[in-house]
Structure formats: C-alpha cells, structure tokens
C-alpha cells in the first residue's frame, strides 16, 4: 500500500468522466413478498459515463455458469471493437441463474444508451447481489434517466 496515491474526486477525478448513483428499489423485496435483508435504502444503481470513446477490456470467469451481464458485456465489447463510453451497474440482484437475465441486461444497456445518446454496444453492464432472483426492470427503467 506504500505506492498507493489517494486522488481526491473519486472516479470523477479523471478528466471527461462523470458518475452518478441512487437508490431505486432493486434491493427492496424478495419474490415471496418478504422484506429483503439488504433493504437499507442505499444506492443500488450507478452509471459511469465518458465524454469520449475509451478502450475497454474484460476479464471473464472460466466458470460454466456465467451471469447475464458477463455475456452481454462480452458481446458488446466484441461488437464495439473494445470501445466503451458507459457502465451501468446494479446491486442487490446478480442477474444470474434466472430465466430472463440476458434480456434484462440488454435492456439495461439499451436504456443507458438511449439516455446518453450513444451506441448500445458502447455500454457495459454489471450486476452484483443475490443469485437466482428475477431482476426487477421497472425500477431500472425509472432510474436510468435520472442518473
């Protein structure tokens, strides 16, 4: 840690980058209607945006089970030639091992691209949280334009 330099400004310290996050309710509840143990109303969606195209690369799991965001990000980076301008991230739900995860990850990228007026293949997506739950897309549809 002796070679670490703390830079004021966080992720936005780098010229040309903007970031935002908010609570939209992804962590709110469980499918059985019970309150989620992680419902603490902390931010559960975030976006990072670059003013210009950036070189981007991914390091992916070798596990046979891959989360939908991993698959969609890998595809988008292949289509864009390794260029990205935005990252959309949610917490509280891993969007993994569910029936429509890939569709939801693609929709997160589409919503982000639309809000930022950039090509959808220049959006990468990440999710972290509980595995096996359906990702609620409505809170994300509401939140993305606000970020």
Sequence positions of predicted segments:
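N-terminal amphipathic/basic leader segments beginning at the initiator methionine
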Residues: 1-65
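Structural motif
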Residues: 44-47, 69, 85-89, 121-124
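Pocket-edge structural micro-motifs
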Residues: 49-51, 74, 91
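Glycine-rich oxoanion-binding loops at beta->alpha junctions
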Residues: 55-81
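Glycine-rich anion/phosphate-binding loops
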Residues: 62-71, 99-109
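Short glycine/serine/threonine-rich phosphate/pyrophosphate-binding segments
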Residues: 79-81, 96-99
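Short glycine-rich or small-residue beta-strand-to-loop segments that form or flank ligand, phosphate
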Residues: 86-98, 124-131
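Glycine-rich, mobile lid/loop segments that gate access to catalytic sites or pores
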Residues: 103-107, 111-147
